[in-house]
Amino acid sequence: MYGKRPFGGDESEEREEDENLFPVFSARSQHDMRVMVSALTQVIGNQQSKSHDNISSIDDNYPSVYNPQDPNQQVAPTHQDQGDLRRRHYRGVRQRPWGKWAAEIRDPKKAARVWLGTFETAESAALAYDEAALKFKGSKAKLNFPERVQLGSNSTYYSSNQIPQMEPQSIPNYNQYYHDASSGDMLSFNLGGGYGSGTGYSMSHDNSTTTAATTSSSSGGSSRQQEEQDYARFWRFGDSSSSPHSGY
């Protein structure tokens, strides 16, 4: 106990003096500190949430572990694959230094290259090569767009197998006269108005068809005479049959 000074009372007195000297500064600094801490926590929280959303979206589109047995799983394309897609090489097509595309093909018969022309796009030059390859090699040709040839062949197949249109049947000539010797239903009449003159028409009635034809005036006259003779015979037969019973 001897030779030692208690420090408890002195320290408490120093603290009270500091608080009395800087009361406003201490309160303001505490308030500012609280505001800064809350602002920093909000900023850090927003950044963490955004980074978490970005990571989750990337994980959804491109899973970290690739499963070759999952057909629905997508794989992020590499820079090399993207370059290959942009620089797709077509058969018989090469690019000129000024940017256009040239197409050429080798003739198997002449063993020489055939110039097909210069085109604005690589696809146009590739199509020109496909057309020339089909002419030279037929179905054995290796094409840049074989799917287009298949579509074209299917369209030609459908067009060739369409139902042919029926030609319109010719209208029969109704003025043509067909004479039927076995037909007993023949009606002859004269439109001339006079005996043995004018134009007569003969009409034949059958179960299926009715024909009409122009006949000469002589046939009309002969049929008229035949009718008069039949009429006279009818009356003569009537007179002969009624005379024995008349009583006169």
From Swiss-Prot:
Domain of life where this protein originates: Eukaryota
Keyword Transcription regulation: yes
DNA-binding region: 89-146
Entry comment describing in which tissues the protein is expressed: Strongly expressed in proliferating cells. Detected in root tips, stipules, shoot apex, floral tissues, young siliques and abscission zones.
Induction: Transiently up-regulated 6 to 15 hours after decapitation.
Bias type Polar residues, positions: 45-80, 239-248
Gene Ontology biological process: defense response to fungus; ethylene-activated signaling pathway
A GO CC annotation given for this chain: nucleus
Record's subcellular location: Nucleus
Region listing for Disordered, in residue ranges: 1-21, 45-90, 201-248
The family this protein is said to belong to: Belongs to the AP2/ERF transcription factor family. ERF subfamily.
Protein name: Ethylene-responsive transcription factor ERF114
Organism, scientific name: Arabidopsis thaliana (Mouse-ear cress)
Gene that encodes the chain: ERF114
